[in-house]
Amino acid sequence: MNAQSNYEFDGQVLGQTNIGFGKEGTKFLGTRYIPEFTFDKEIDSLSSFAIETSFNLSLSKTNILGHSSDANSNLSPYRIWLRYLKKNWELRLGLQKIDFGSAQLLRPIQWFNQIDPRDPLGLTNGVYGLLIRHYFKNNSNLWLWGLYGNEKQRGLDALTTLNDSPEFGGRFQTFIPKGEAALSYHYREAEANNIPFFENYSSPEHRIGFDSKIDIGFGMWTELTYVHRTKNIGILTNQLLLNFGVDYTFRIGNGLTVSKEYLFSDSTDSMTNESLRRGFSALSFNYPLGLSSSLSGLIYQQWNNNTQTLMLNYQQQFNSLSGYIILYYNPKTVEGIQQNDIFQSFSGPGIQLLIVFNH
């Protein structure tokens, strides 16, 4: 049998405008292009080799009332990885997306990406590392990873990663009656250069994660992360993040899918037992208006300060072209959900228009 090779060149072009109706009167205009090249070679019937390379090219301009306009341009790698598949094994090396867990909106185990639940495209920066996965005959799977060179905050991280320090961990996922469950572990050296008075702090950090999801006529899941730092840093020494969620599709019209999640956060000082507890909730819905259009929404509540984030999104699909009209309201401070430097959203009320072309 002759080995087969495949080449593909794809890409995504995004045009975006965002108008804030708050006191600052912020206006944003931007474009983004993510070209993607993939090469896939079949070695034999049980093994293959693949390469993916993509870049993130962005141009933007921001105007705030009473301030001069700010223009930015950026070119950075988005994904650059090599993958080797051999029977039940997968090895992937390079800049890649690593994502797992059962929660949809408020995600304690969002350890390695920056996906914002308000972003309809789910864009995120990747991490540099080696990922190894083994798939067992009973459909259970084992993940092992090692990371290096990823100093930025990710997910709900309170601290950053120490420069030039390796990270490693693993995950085992298996099936349970009516669903699946997984146990995860990750180790890194954390530093606090983003926190005043703790700029010289660094400490080994251990985190354990558990997640499960079952289908009992409706979806139900839980997700948990416990983080322990061996050196005391006040209430950030120990952190517990616990999520409960459900979803159900109602037989209304074309089918209304509703999801509800709760996130509980508890940070504790090992020496004084001082703690900080916070609560968050999120409600989302999605309703298909037809074969090519849908309406979705998100209500996000921060219980400690009684503030809300609201979003209503209309999507229209035209073959390779998609359009989004997003109405939103964000408080000045948003906690409990991931925010990144790719998806632009401002405080106060506003409207966002997205046009996406995939080739």
What are these regions (language model features)?
Residues 4, 42-46, 86-89, 98, ...:
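Outer-membrane beta-barrel channels and translocator barrels
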Residues 12-23, 52, 56-57, 113-117, ...:
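Transmembrane beta-strand segments that form the barrel wall of outer-membrane beta-barrel proteins
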Residues 36-38, 80-83, 131-133, 171-173, ...:
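Outer-membrane beta-barrel architecture
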Residues 40-142, 147, 174, 332:
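Outer membrane beta-barrel
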Residues 176, 213-302:
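Detector for outer-membrane/organellar transmembrane beta-barrel domains
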Residues 316-318, 328, 345-359:
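Outer-membrane beta-barrel "beta-signal"
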